[in-house]
Swiss-Prot record:
Keywords in alphabetical order: Cytoplasm, Endonuclease, Hydrolase, Metal-binding, Nuclease, Ribosome biogenesis, rRNA processing, Zinc
Xref: HAMAP family: Endoribonucl_YbeY
Species per Swiss-Prot/TrEMBL record: Pseudomonas fluorescens (strain Pf0-1)
Stated name of the protein: Endoribonuclease YbeY
InterPro entries according to UniProt: MetalPrtase_cat_dom_sf_prd (IPR023091), YbeY (IPR002036), YbeY_CS (IPR020549)
Cofactors that this protein relies on: Zn(2+)
Transmembrane segments: none
Main localization (coarse): cytoplasm
Subcellular location as annotated: Cytoplasm
Purpose of the protein: Single strand-specific metallo-endoribonuclease involved in late-stage 70S ribosome quality control and in maturation of the 3' terminus of the 16S rRNA.
Length: 164
């Protein structure tokens, strides 16, 4: 079971809690243990501030991933971590990239959840493994390959607080 804490700190429209839960549970289904995570939806100001604090980048990014650093034995339910999603950036990217907004949301949530599970895209081999899993999961939802039309970028700009 997934315990999802959805925090909405923006007035911008966003997917429903049920949609976020569906995308997270799909990405996390390989994990058999109960899990807890937070998704915080933010505006560009908060997104920029967090990106600056954790990555020293002075702009809002689409998703920041913060894997939990608390050993599971200290918790009732294992804490996976937090995703912080900047709604305006997600909307802008979907428009600029000609992608269906729901498909882009699903992709970024799945991508962020995979980061919480330890997946990364620092080198080509890791990126290929992560992207293949993203494609597979998105196809199950009926969404197209998010990388099909993008030969130059191998991964969304989802970042973890540890990656620089």
């Amino acid at each position: 079971m997934l315990e999802l804490d959805l925090q909405i700190a923006t007035e911008a429209p966003a997917p429903t809690e049920a949609e976020f839960r569906q995308w997270c549970e799909l990405a996390l289904r390989q994990r058999t243990a109960d899990s807890e995570m937070t998704i915080r939806l933010v505006d560009e100001d908060e997104g920029r501030e967090l990106n600056h604090t954790w990555r020293h980048k002075d702009y809002a990014t689409n998703v920041l991933s913060f894997p939990a650093e608390v050993p599971d034995e200290f918790l009732d339910i294992p804490l996976l971590g937090d995703l912080v999603i900047c709604v305006a950036v997600v909307e802008r990217e979907a428009t600029e990239q000609g992608k269906e907004l729901k498909a882009h949301w699903a992709h970024l949530v799945i991508h962020g959840c995979l980061h919480l599970l330890g997946y990364d895209h620092i080198d080509d081999e890791e990126a290929e493994e992560m992207e293949a899993l993203e494609r597979e999961l998105l196809a199950e939802l009926g969404y197209p390959d998010p990388y099909a039309d993008d030969e130059t970028e191998t991964s969304p700009t989802v970042t973890t607080k540890d990656s620089e």
